[in-house]
């Protein structure tokens, strides 16, 4: 008995579509950051591609739901990190305070499942802010924009792949 199962046609399409969507997100954001900021946007490309992969789910409904959760978690991190970085230099202690505050906000919003998104975004923002203190306050703005682009490309990519595949097969779109 084999542990691995033979991939279906949809499994192959899904894999290629997700990879393509992630590469598109990465490319779009690296080019946008380079055009706007005048330097490589590797972190922006990375963050957009991660957001795309995060929302590329098994069904269109799950993909949209993941996109909403990702956006809420990122917005909470943005709302906490931006004013903090306007007023106080980035530090590990500050990151800890923001992580606790973000977790509490997500609990109050009854979005327990999205705490990890808020935490991951906060960690990335604060670590990059520590590495580049001169532009620290820009990090929440960049990560919010990267996330939105990644979500849009990921959800759209999933919906397009599902529509094309299931329409071609004459089956209900999932």
Residue ranges and their predicted role:
Residues 1-174:
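Alpha-helical transmembrane segments and their membrane-interface boundaries
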